[in-house]
Amino acid sequence: MLVLRFIQLSKLAAVGSLVALSAFGLPANVDRVVAEEIHSGVHPSPAVILQVLKAFDNPEGAIFSADGNHVFVSNSAEAGALSDGFGWVEGAGYISKLEVKANGELSMVTKRLITGITAPLGMGVLPVATKKFPAGTIFLCTGSAPLIDSNGQAVKDRGRMRSKLLAFNDAGEVLGEIDTGQGSAFERINGSPIILINALGFDADGNIYVTDSAIGGDQFDPPFEGKGGLWMIPHSALDALADGRTPSDPPVFVEIPGNPDGVEVSPTDGKIYVNTVGAFAGLTDPANGGVYALSKEDIANNNLGQMIDSGLGALDGLDFTADGVMLNAQIRGDIPGKITVNCKGELATTLVLQPGGAMSNLTGPADIAVRRYADGAQLLVIPELFARDATPGDDEVTVLALPAGFDTACTRDVAGLN
Protein backbone atom coordinates (compact mmCIF):
# COMPACT_ATOMS: atom_id res chain seq x y z
CA MET A 1 0.00 0.00 0.00
CA LEU A 2 2.91 2.37 0.61
CA VAL A 3 4.05 1.77 -2.97
CA LEU A 4 0.51 2.44 -4.20
CA ARG A 5 0.29 5.67 -2.18
CA PHE A 6 3.62 6.82 -3.61
CA ILE A 7 2.35 6.19 -7.13
CA GLN A 8 -0.83 8.16 -6.42
CA LEU A 9 1.13 11.09 -4.97
CA SER A 10 3.48 11.01 -7.95
CA LYS A 11 0.52 11.21 -10.29
CA LEU A 12 -0.89 14.18 -8.40
CA ALA A 13 2.46 15.94 -8.73
CA ALA A 14 2.47 15.16 -12.43
CA VAL A 15 -0.93 16.83 -12.85
CA GLY A 16 0.53 20.02 -11.45
CA SER A 17 3.44 19.70 -13.86
CA LEU A 18 1.01 19.20 -16.72
CA VAL A 19 -0.74 22.48 -16.00
CA ALA A 20 2.61 24.23 -15.70
CA LEU A 21 3.75 22.83 -19.05
CA SER A 22 0.55 24.03 -20.70
CA ALA A 23 0.91 27.47 -19.15
CA PHE A 24 4.40 27.81 -20.60
CA GLY A 25 3.04 27.04 -24.07
CA LEU A 26 4.79 23.75 -24.76
CA PRO A 27 3.39 21.77 -27.69
CA ALA A 28 0.01 20.14 -27.14
CA ASN A 29 1.39 16.69 -27.98
CA VAL A 30 3.79 16.92 -25.05
CA ASP A 31 0.87 17.59 -22.72
CA ARG A 32 -1.09 14.75 -24.24
CA VAL A 33 1.65 12.17 -23.68
CA VAL A 34 1.90 13.19 -20.04
CA ALA A 35 -1.88 13.18 -19.66
CA GLU A 36 -2.25 9.72 -21.19
CA GLU A 37 0.32 8.31 -18.78
CA ILE A 38 -1.35 9.94 -15.77
CA HIS A 39 -4.85 8.76 -16.73
CA SER A 40 -3.97 5.33 -18.11
CA GLY A 41 -6.01 3.33 -15.58
CA VAL A 42 -9.50 1.89 -16.00
CA HIS A 43 -12.33 1.79 -13.49
CA PRO A 44 -12.59 -1.74 -12.01
CA SER A 45 -16.33 -2.04 -12.71
CA PRO A 46 -17.20 -1.96 -16.46
CA ALA A 47 -20.47 -0.59 -17.78
CA VAL A 48 -22.83 -2.71 -19.86
CA ILE A 49 -24.31 -1.28 -23.05
CA LEU A 50 -28.07 -1.77 -22.83
CA GLN A 51 -29.15 0.14 -25.90
CA VAL A 52 -28.08 2.45 -28.70
CA LEU A 53 -31.05 4.50 -29.89
CA LYS A 54 -30.79 6.09 -33.34
CA ALA A 55 -33.66 8.56 -33.21
CA PHE A 56 -32.27 12.05 -32.62
CA ASP A 57 -30.78 15.18 -34.20
CA ASN A 58 -27.44 16.07 -32.63
CA PRO A 59 -28.51 15.15 -29.09
CA GLU A 60 -26.61 17.30 -26.60
CA GLY A 61 -28.29 16.91 -23.21
CA ALA A 62 -30.20 14.30 -21.22
CA ILE A 63 -31.98 14.47 -17.86
CA PHE A 64 -34.14 12.11 -15.80
CA SER A 65 -37.50 13.34 -14.56
CA ALA A 66 -37.82 13.84 -10.81
CA ASP A 67 -39.53 10.45 -10.40
CA GLY A 68 -37.05 8.67 -12.68
CA ASN A 69 -39.78 7.38 -14.99
CA HIS A 70 -38.78 9.45 -18.01
CA VAL A 71 -35.73 10.82 -19.76
CA PHE A 72 -35.73 14.08 -21.71
CA VAL A 73 -33.21 14.62 -24.53
CA SER A 74 -32.29 17.98 -26.07
CA ASN A 75 -31.83 17.80 -29.84
CA SER A 76 -29.49 20.70 -30.54
CA ALA A 77 -29.72 20.82 -34.36
CA GLU A 78 -26.02 21.43 -34.75
CA ALA A 79 -24.63 22.08 -38.21
CA GLY A 80 -21.14 22.35 -39.61
CA ALA A 81 -17.85 21.78 -37.83
CA LEU A 82 -15.34 23.99 -36.11
CA SER A 83 -13.38 24.35 -39.34
CA ASP A 84 -16.34 25.41 -41.50
CA GLY A 85 -18.70 27.44 -39.36
CA PHE A 86 -20.04 25.23 -36.58
CA GLY A 87 -23.24 26.54 -35.01
CA TRP A 88 -26.76 25.87 -33.79
CA VAL A 89 -29.51 26.28 -36.41
CA GLU A 90 -32.02 28.93 -35.34
CA GLY A 91 -35.35 27.45 -34.26
CA ALA A 92 -34.49 23.92 -35.37
CA GLY A 93 -33.93 22.30 -31.96
CA TYR A 94 -36.45 20.28 -29.97
CA ILE A 95 -36.95 18.18 -26.83
CA SER A 96 -37.71 14.44 -26.91
CA LYS A 97 -39.45 12.51 -24.11
CA LEU A 98 -38.70 8.84 -23.47
CA GLU A 99 -39.97 6.29 -20.95
CA VAL A 100 -37.63 4.24 -18.76
CA LYS A 101 -38.75 0.60 -19.06
CA ALA A 102 -38.35 -2.04 -16.35
CA ASN A 103 -35.28 -3.52 -18.08
CA GLY A 104 -33.54 -0.14 -18.17
CA GLU A 105 -34.07 0.50 -21.86
CA LEU A 106 -35.71 3.67 -23.14
CA SER A 107 -38.73 3.89 -25.43
CA MET A 108 -39.87 7.00 -27.25
CA VAL A 109 -43.01 8.67 -25.88
CA THR A 110 -42.98 11.93 -27.84
CA LYS A 111 -40.17 12.62 -30.27
CA ARG A 112 -40.92 16.36 -30.59
CA LEU A 113 -42.35 17.33 -27.22
CA ILE A 114 -41.23 20.98 -27.47
CA THR A 115 -40.20 22.39 -30.85
CA GLY A 116 -38.88 25.58 -32.41
CA ILE A 117 -36.02 25.96 -29.94
CA THR A 118 -32.60 27.38 -30.72
CA ALA A 119 -29.63 25.52 -29.23
CA PRO A 120 -31.30 23.39 -26.54
CA LEU A 121 -28.37 22.12 -24.46
CA GLY A 122 -28.02 21.13 -20.79
CA MET A 123 -30.92 20.56 -18.38
CA GLY A 124 -31.60 20.20 -14.67
CA VAL A 125 -34.53 19.42 -12.37
CA LEU A 126 -35.66 21.93 -9.73
CA PRO A 127 -35.69 20.16 -6.31
CA VAL A 128 -37.49 22.88 -4.30
CA ALA A 129 -40.64 24.65 -5.47
CA THR A 130 -41.00 28.40 -5.85
CA LYS A 131 -44.34 30.22 -6.12
CA LYS A 132 -44.00 30.10 -9.91
CA PHE A 133 -42.23 26.78 -10.52
CA PRO A 134 -43.25 23.46 -8.90
CA ALA A 135 -40.60 21.03 -7.69
CA GLY A 136 -39.67 18.78 -10.60
CA THR A 137 -39.73 21.62 -13.15
CA ILE A 138 -37.06 21.08 -15.80
CA PHE A 139 -34.83 24.03 -16.65
CA LEU A 140 -33.16 24.08 -20.09
CA CYS A 141 -30.20 26.09 -21.39
CA THR A 142 -31.15 27.52 -24.78
CA GLY A 143 -30.69 30.36 -27.28
CA SER A 144 -26.89 30.35 -27.36
CA ALA A 145 -24.21 31.30 -29.82
CA PRO A 146 -22.70 30.30 -32.16
CA LEU A 147 -25.78 30.72 -34.35
CA ILE A 148 -26.42 29.94 -38.00
CA ASP A 149 -29.57 30.53 -40.02
CA SER A 150 -31.53 27.98 -42.04
CA ASN A 151 -29.25 28.65 -45.03
CA GLY A 152 -26.13 27.79 -43.07
CA GLN A 153 -24.93 31.38 -42.74
CA ALA A 154 -23.49 32.82 -39.54
CA VAL A 155 -25.87 35.22 -37.81
CA LYS A 156 -24.36 38.70 -37.41
CA ASP A 157 -27.30 40.50 -35.80
CA ARG A 158 -26.70 40.72 -32.04
CA GLY A 159 -30.44 40.94 -31.40
CA ARG A 160 -30.96 37.36 -32.56
CA MET A 161 -28.79 35.91 -29.79
CA ARG A 162 -31.32 35.42 -26.97
CA SER A 163 -29.80 33.08 -24.40
CA LYS A 164 -32.13 32.02 -21.60
CA LEU A 165 -33.27 29.32 -19.21
CA LEU A 166 -36.54 27.77 -20.39
CA ALA A 167 -38.68 26.03 -17.73
CA PHE A 168 -41.11 23.22 -18.60
CA ASN A 169 -42.92 20.34 -16.90
CA ASP A 170 -43.01 16.62 -17.67
CA ALA A 171 -45.94 17.14 -20.03
CA GLY A 172 -43.93 19.59 -22.12
CA GLU A 173 -45.84 22.68 -20.97
CA VAL A 174 -43.60 25.76 -20.86
CA LEU A 175 -43.92 27.38 -17.43
CA GLY A 176 -41.72 30.41 -17.95
CA GLU A 177 -38.22 31.54 -18.81
CA ILE A 178 -35.32 33.50 -17.37
CA ASP A 179 -33.67 35.90 -19.80
CA THR A 180 -29.87 35.75 -19.72
CA GLY A 181 -29.32 37.72 -22.93
CA GLN A 182 -29.05 41.39 -23.85
CA GLY A 183 -30.63 43.75 -21.36
CA SER A 184 -30.90 41.04 -18.71
CA ALA A 185 -29.70 41.18 -15.11
CA PHE A 186 -26.77 39.03 -16.18
CA GLU A 187 -25.57 41.61 -18.69
CA ARG A 188 -25.94 44.37 -16.11
CA ILE A 189 -23.80 42.42 -13.63
CA ASN A 190 -21.11 41.19 -16.01
CA GLY A 191 -21.10 43.67 -18.89
CA SER A 192 -22.09 40.93 -21.33
CA PRO A 193 -25.02 38.58 -21.76
CA ILE A 194 -24.46 34.87 -21.30
CA ILE A 195 -23.15 33.89 -24.72
CA LEU A 196 -23.09 30.09 -24.66
CA ILE A 197 -25.36 29.02 -21.82
CA ASN A 198 -24.25 25.42 -21.77
CA ALA A 199 -25.14 23.41 -18.68
CA LEU A 200 -26.77 23.72 -15.28
CA GLY A 201 -27.09 21.95 -11.96
CA PHE A 202 -29.08 22.45 -8.77
CA ASP A 203 -28.05 22.13 -5.15
CA ALA A 204 -30.39 20.74 -2.48
CA ASP A 205 -31.69 24.23 -1.67
CA GLY A 206 -32.75 24.89 -5.26
CA ASN A 207 -29.97 27.32 -6.19
CA ILE A 208 -28.99 27.00 -9.87
CA TYR A 209 -25.41 26.85 -11.15
CA VAL A 210 -25.06 27.74 -14.85
CA THR A 211 -21.98 27.70 -17.08
CA ASP A 212 -21.21 30.21 -19.80
CA SER A 213 -18.68 28.66 -22.18
CA ALA A 214 -18.36 32.11 -23.84
CA ILE A 215 -17.82 30.67 -27.33
CA GLY A 216 -19.30 32.32 -30.44
CA GLY A 217 -19.56 35.95 -29.35
CA ASP A 218 -17.11 37.06 -32.02
CA GLN A 219 -19.53 36.18 -34.85
CA PHE A 220 -21.72 39.21 -34.14
CA ASP A 221 -21.28 42.78 -35.36
CA PRO A 222 -20.12 44.27 -33.10
CA PRO A 223 -18.87 41.21 -31.20
CA PHE A 224 -19.81 40.29 -27.65
CA GLU A 225 -16.83 40.38 -25.30
CA GLY A 226 -17.94 37.65 -22.92
CA LYS A 227 -16.25 35.91 -20.03
CA GLY A 228 -16.31 32.17 -19.48
CA GLY A 229 -17.41 31.21 -16.01
CA LEU A 230 -19.99 29.99 -13.55
CA TRP A 231 -23.18 31.74 -12.47
CA MET A 232 -24.95 31.02 -9.18
CA ILE A 233 -28.63 32.00 -9.31
CA PRO A 234 -30.22 31.95 -5.85
CA HIS A 235 -33.43 29.98 -5.46
CA SER A 236 -35.00 33.13 -4.02
CA ALA A 237 -34.30 35.00 -7.27
CA LEU A 238 -35.94 32.59 -9.73
CA ASP A 239 -39.45 34.02 -9.68
CA ALA A 240 -38.30 37.63 -9.87
CA LEU A 241 -35.99 36.92 -12.80
CA ALA A 242 -38.71 34.97 -14.61
CA ASP A 243 -41.08 37.93 -14.16
CA GLY A 244 -38.49 40.41 -15.44
CA ARG A 245 -37.99 41.98 -12.02
CA THR A 246 -34.70 42.77 -10.28
CA PRO A 247 -34.20 40.23 -7.47
CA SER A 248 -33.15 41.33 -4.00
CA ASP A 249 -30.64 38.45 -4.03
CA PRO A 250 -28.94 38.79 -7.45
CA PRO A 251 -26.95 36.18 -9.40
CA VAL A 252 -23.22 35.89 -8.70
CA PHE A 253 -20.48 35.22 -11.28
CA VAL A 254 -17.07 33.54 -10.99
CA GLU A 255 -14.72 33.60 -13.98
CA ILE A 256 -13.24 30.18 -14.85
CA PRO A 257 -10.44 29.74 -17.43
CA GLY A 258 -10.61 27.25 -20.27
CA ASN A 259 -14.27 27.69 -21.31
CA PRO A 260 -16.31 25.90 -18.63
CA ASP A 261 -18.93 23.45 -19.84
CA GLY A 262 -20.35 20.78 -17.52
CA VAL A 263 -21.50 21.58 -13.99
CA GLU A 264 -23.05 19.53 -11.20
CA VAL A 265 -23.32 19.55 -7.42
CA SER A 266 -21.83 16.58 -5.58
CA PRO A 267 -24.39 14.62 -3.54
CA THR A 268 -21.74 13.85 -0.91
CA ASP A 269 -19.68 17.00 -0.26
CA GLY A 270 -22.08 19.64 -1.63
CA LYS A 271 -19.38 21.33 -3.71
CA ILE A 272 -20.02 22.59 -7.22
CA TYR A 273 -17.89 20.84 -9.84
CA VAL A 274 -17.17 22.45 -13.21
CA ASN A 275 -15.21 21.05 -16.17
CA THR A 276 -13.62 22.79 -19.16
CA VAL A 277 -14.04 22.25 -22.90
CA GLY A 278 -11.69 24.86 -24.41
CA ALA A 279 -9.50 22.37 -26.24
CA PHE A 280 -12.52 21.35 -28.33
CA ALA A 281 -12.69 24.76 -29.96
CA GLY A 282 -8.92 25.23 -30.23
CA LEU A 283 -9.04 27.78 -27.43
CA THR A 284 -6.63 28.27 -24.56
CA ASP A 285 -7.32 25.99 -21.63
CA PRO A 286 -4.56 26.02 -18.99
CA ALA A 287 -5.89 22.74 -17.60
CA ASN A 288 -6.25 21.04 -21.02
CA GLY A 289 -9.54 19.59 -19.89
CA GLY A 290 -9.77 20.25 -16.17
CA VAL A 291 -12.21 19.85 -13.30
CA TYR A 292 -12.64 22.52 -10.62
CA ALA A 293 -14.36 22.12 -7.25
CA LEU A 294 -15.93 25.26 -5.77
CA SER A 295 -17.68 25.76 -2.46
CA LYS A 296 -20.49 28.26 -2.00
CA GLU A 297 -17.98 30.40 -0.13
CA ASP A 298 -15.64 30.32 -3.13
CA ILE A 299 -18.42 31.64 -5.33
CA ALA A 300 -19.45 34.32 -2.85
CA ASN A 301 -15.83 35.50 -2.59
CA ASN A 302 -15.07 35.23 -6.33
CA ASN A 303 -12.52 32.44 -5.82
CA LEU A 304 -11.76 29.88 -8.50
CA GLY A 305 -11.73 26.97 -6.07
CA GLN A 306 -9.52 23.90 -6.38
CA MET A 307 -8.51 22.16 -9.61
CA ILE A 308 -8.84 18.47 -8.84
CA ASP A 309 -7.84 16.99 -12.21
CA SER A 310 -6.52 18.09 -15.61
CA GLY A 311 -5.20 16.86 -18.94
CA LEU A 312 -8.46 15.11 -19.82
CA GLY A 313 -8.95 16.57 -23.32
CA ALA A 314 -12.15 18.54 -23.90
CA LEU A 315 -14.79 17.83 -21.31
CA ASP A 316 -18.51 18.28 -21.88
CA GLY A 317 -21.03 16.59 -19.60
CA LEU A 318 -20.48 16.06 -15.88
CA ASP A 319 -22.62 14.10 -13.43
CA PHE A 320 -22.37 12.14 -10.19
CA THR A 321 -23.49 8.66 -9.23
CA ALA A 322 -25.62 8.28 -6.11
CA ASP A 323 -22.56 7.85 -3.87
CA GLY A 324 -20.61 10.74 -5.35
CA VAL A 325 -18.44 9.12 -8.02
CA MET A 326 -17.88 11.75 -10.72
CA LEU A 327 -18.32 11.03 -14.43
CA ASN A 328 -17.10 13.31 -17.22
CA ALA A 329 -17.62 13.06 -20.99
CA GLN A 330 -14.57 13.64 -23.21
CA ILE A 331 -15.84 15.14 -26.48
CA ARG A 332 -12.70 16.29 -28.30
CA GLY A 333 -12.83 15.00 -31.86
CA ASP A 334 -9.17 14.17 -32.54
CA ILE A 335 -8.93 11.74 -29.59
CA PRO A 336 -11.45 9.01 -28.74
CA GLY A 337 -14.66 10.03 -27.05
CA LYS A 338 -15.03 8.38 -23.67
CA ILE A 339 -16.41 8.62 -20.15
CA THR A 340 -13.92 9.18 -17.35
CA VAL A 341 -14.45 8.21 -13.71
CA ASN A 342 -13.16 10.11 -10.67
CA CYS A 343 -13.46 8.21 -7.42
CA LYS A 344 -13.35 10.58 -4.46
CA GLY A 345 -9.84 11.99 -4.04
CA GLU A 346 -8.49 10.10 -7.06
CA LEU A 347 -7.45 11.04 -10.58
CA ALA A 348 -9.61 10.04 -13.52
CA THR A 349 -9.71 6.56 -14.98
CA THR A 350 -11.56 5.34 -18.08
CA LEU A 351 -14.96 3.68 -18.01
CA VAL A 352 -14.82 0.45 -20.01
CA LEU A 353 -17.93 -0.37 -22.06
CA GLN A 354 -19.00 -3.97 -22.68
CA PRO A 355 -19.40 -5.48 -25.16
CA GLY A 356 -16.63 -3.81 -27.11
CA GLY A 357 -16.57 -3.18 -30.83
CA ALA A 358 -18.54 -0.61 -32.78
CA MET A 359 -21.27 -0.28 -30.15
CA SER A 360 -18.72 1.02 -27.65
CA ASN A 361 -17.54 3.86 -29.91
CA LEU A 362 -18.89 7.12 -28.51
CA THR A 363 -19.17 9.91 -31.08
CA GLY A 364 -19.01 13.18 -29.21
CA PRO A 365 -20.43 12.21 -25.80
CA ALA A 366 -22.03 15.33 -24.36
CA ASP A 367 -24.24 16.23 -21.36
CA ILE A 368 -24.73 12.89 -19.59
CA ALA A 369 -27.30 11.87 -16.95
CA VAL A 370 -27.13 9.10 -14.33
CA ARG A 371 -29.71 7.75 -11.88
CA ARG A 372 -29.80 4.89 -9.36
CA TYR A 373 -32.80 2.54 -9.17
CA ALA A 374 -34.19 0.32 -6.42
CA ASP A 375 -32.01 -2.69 -7.23
CA GLY A 376 -28.83 -0.62 -6.77
CA ALA A 377 -27.94 -0.54 -10.46
CA GLN A 378 -27.56 2.85 -12.14
CA LEU A 379 -28.48 3.98 -15.64
CA LEU A 380 -26.17 6.30 -17.56
CA VAL A 381 -27.62 8.07 -20.60
CA ILE A 382 -25.09 9.47 -23.10
CA PRO A 383 -26.21 11.83 -25.89
CA GLU A 384 -23.77 11.69 -28.82
CA LEU A 385 -23.58 15.18 -30.28
CA PHE A 386 -21.41 14.29 -33.28
CA ALA A 387 -23.22 11.08 -34.29
CA ARG A 388 -24.15 12.72 -37.58
CA ASP A 389 -25.03 11.23 -40.92
CA ALA A 390 -26.78 12.46 -44.05
CA THR A 391 -30.32 11.70 -42.89
CA PRO A 392 -32.21 13.50 -40.11
CA GLY A 393 -33.60 11.86 -37.01
CA ASP A 394 -31.20 8.97 -36.52
CA ASP A 395 -28.35 10.29 -34.39
CA GLU A 396 -27.44 8.28 -31.31
CA VAL A 397 -28.08 8.15 -27.59
CA THR A 398 -26.35 5.30 -25.76
CA VAL A 399 -27.77 3.81 -22.55
CA LEU A 400 -25.41 2.08 -20.11
CA ALA A 401 -26.01 0.04 -16.97
CA LEU A 402 -23.58 0.66 -14.14
CA PRO A 403 -23.68 -2.49 -11.95
CA ALA A 404 -24.76 -2.34 -8.32
CA GLY A 405 -21.13 -2.49 -7.18
CA PHE A 406 -19.95 0.37 -9.38
CA ASP A 407 -19.48 2.92 -6.59
CA THR A 408 -17.96 0.51 -4.08
CA ALA A 409 -15.44 -0.56 -6.73
CA CYS A 410 -13.70 2.72 -5.92
CA THR A 411 -12.29 1.02 -2.82
CA ARG A 412 -10.27 -1.24 -5.09
CA ASP A 413 -7.06 0.02 -6.67
CA VAL A 414 -8.02 1.56 -10.00
CA ALA A 415 -4.64 0.68 -11.50
CA GLY A 416 -5.04 -2.99 -10.62
CA LEU A 417 -2.01 -3.00 -8.32
CA ASN A 418 -3.52 -4.68 -5.25
Predicted feature descriptions by range:
Residues A55-G68, A92, I114-P146, Q182-I208, ...:
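Beta-rich, blade/repeat-based domains predominating
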Residues A77-L82, S144-D149, I215-D218, A279-G282, ...:
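Short glycine/acidic-enriched loop and turn motifs that connect beta-strands
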Residues E36-F56:
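A short helix->beta-strand "capping" segment at the edge of beta-propeller domains
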Residues L98-G104, G172, P234-A242, L294-A300, ...:
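Short loop/turn segments immediately following beta-strands, especially the blade-tip
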Residues Q51-D84, V89-G91:
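Beta-strand-rich domains and repeat architectures in extracellular enzymes and scaffolds
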Residues L2-S17:
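Bacterial N-terminal signal peptides that target proteins for export
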Residues D84-G87, G91-S96, S163-L166, G228-W231, ...:
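A short loop-to-beta-strand structural motif that recurs across blades of beta-propeller domains
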